[in-house]
Amino acid sequence: GCAVLSLWGCNMPENERVTMIHGAGGAVMAKLIEKFVLPYFGGFEGAEVGLEVLDDAAVVDGVVFKSDSHAVRPIFFPGGDIGRLAVAGTVNDIAVLGAEPLALACGFVLEEGLAFGDLERVLASIKAACEEAGVFVVTGDTKVVEKGSLGGLVVNMSGI
């Protein structure tokens, strides 16, 4: 076996690091998941659509389940914002598997110094997108991290 687990083979230096391309979807992200994530979390045989399929959502006992994290800069952009993106992406990935989205969980990681006005704009956008999709946020979580560590906020949206 390899001395160092690698995305590209057995000879990756130990100081290799994650880059932005690893989070951009496609073949590079698939290799990251296959080499690093699946050895720890794969193997659940009770799923109709499980992690190994590398789909955007899972199906367990007929229930479609999705989780998606969003970290974009700027958080407001032409045509939308991080909140609308989080709802739309989650609802879309559930619908693509033929299910009707029922409920969402929304987690926030807020950077110290984020303007409350920006937070309210994101929350209002999430609410509007939920109303358009016919779903509700029914649970969630909020954490705050030190200034300079995020670039604003990260939104995780999960749904069934």
Each model region followed by its residue ranges:
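Glycine-rich phosphate/pyrophosphate-binding loop regions near the starts of catalytic domains
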Residues: 19, 27-160
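Short linear motifs in intrinsically disordered/low-complexity regions
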Residues: 11-12, 142
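Generic N-terminal amphipathic, Lys/Arg-enriched alpha-helix
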Residues: 12-21
